[in-house]
Design a protein with these regions (language model features):
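N-terminal signal peptide c-region/cleavage motif recognized by signal peptidases
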Residues: 4-5
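Secreted/extracellular ectodomain signature
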Residues: 8-136
Length: 136
């Protein structure tokens, strides 16, 4: 029975094998649309400043911040544009499970967003791999 439960759990994406000079993880855990927009603004500014080849950036959402990554979000075009530059987005499976309890079904994410078992743990893993955390 444990084996089948593990198969259903979100698989942790592997840590990026990157030679980027700047490794950054950004946290979004706030439901405030202003803060969510700020995270996207900062990400866009970092891409412009460092260039996508000199920087590896992952935006990790957990708690109410996951709303930023839900399908149909007003920021979907901006998220897709950042993805096109190589920015990665990860959403917390724990949060999605809690949303499902409230909504009666799991919400859909914007296509291309990874699901990680625990958003906070993902940030810790990336920190341990040399990433610096930004929380605008």
């Amino acid at each position: 029975m444990l084996v089948s439960l593990n198969v259903l759990a979100a698989q942790e994406p592997p840590l990026p094998d990157t030679f980027a000079e700047h490794k950054i993880v950004m946290q979004i855990s706030d439901p405030n649309p202003f803060k969510q927009t700020l995270v996207l603004n900062v990400a866009g500014n970092l891409v412009k400043y460092y260039g996508s080849t000199n920087m590896d950036l992952e935006i990790v959402a957990f708690g109410p911040g996951v709303r930023l990554m839900l399908e149909g979000n007003v920021n979907t075009p901006r998220i897709k544009a950042l993805m096109a530059t190589g920015v990665r987005f990860s959403a917390c499976e724990n949060t999605l499970t809690n949303f499902a309890k409230i909504l009666g079904k799991k919400p859909k994410l914007i296509e291309g967003i990874d699901i990680v078992p625990a958003g906070a743990a993902r940030i810790i893993q990336l920190n341990e791999a040399g990433y610096k955390t930004l929380k605008p």
